[in-house]
């Protein structure tokens, strides 16, 4: 799960991976993260254990992949806006980001409360370094500061 923006999946593969992510999300309503087993996830997702292990080694990788898909969707939306949101520091851009991720607030808060904050902040940092730094030429430390601040305001 190392590469957030360059790994491409076909529609069927993406659907299977999202079923696994959605199953995990639903199970978080029923159990603590630590009590969820791979067998619970595959049963809920309607896939085999072999399919799960084809994509992931751990349930953390499944969470990471699901969250990365959310971030990819955000990137796609921002790129589709063709600059209408303004500079990424602008209020309109910040409000758009908060509004976009608010639709996933339950999932984000569940993974943060499960002790997986690192998955969220790593995805944020990867987005900033790979998508924002090349455009705005902002130093890494400033991007990390901005990302951490935005994420902490959100949660």
Language-model segments: which ranges?
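N-terminal intrinsically disordered/low-complexity leader segments
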Residues: 1-13
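Alpha-helix N-cap/helix-initiation sites
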Residues: 13, 17, 34-35, 139-147
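Alpha-helical structural segments
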Residues: 15-26, 30, 44, 61-81, ...
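Helix-turn-helix
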Residues: 27-61
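Short helix-to-loop capping/linker segments positioned immediately adjacent to catalytic or ligand/cofactor-binding
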Residues: 84-86, 108-113
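Amphipathic alpha-helical segments that line or abut small-molecule/effector binding pockets
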Residues: 87-106, 144
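Amphipathic alpha-helical packing segments from all-alpha helical-bundle domains
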Residues: 91-93, 112-148
């Amino acid at each position: 799960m190392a590469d957030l923006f360059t790994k491409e999946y076909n529609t069927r593969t993406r659907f299977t991976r999202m079923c696994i992510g959605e199953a995990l999300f639903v199970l978080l309503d029923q159990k603590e993260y630590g009590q969820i087993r791979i067998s619970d996830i595959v049963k809920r997702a309607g896939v085999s254990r072999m399919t799960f292990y084809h994509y992931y080694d751990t349930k953390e990788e499944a969470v990471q992949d699901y969250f990365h898909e959310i971030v990819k969707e955000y990137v796609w939306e921002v790129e589709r806006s063709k600059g209408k949101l303004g500079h990424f520091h602008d209020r309109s851009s910040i409000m758009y980001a908060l509004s976009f991720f608010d639709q996933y607030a339950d999932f984000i808060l569940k993974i943060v409360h499960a002790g997986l904050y690192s998955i969220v902040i790593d995805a944020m940092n990867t987005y900033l370094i790979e998508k924002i730094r090349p455009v705005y030429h902002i130093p890494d430390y400033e991007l990390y500061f901005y990302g951490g601040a935005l994420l902490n305001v959100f949660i």
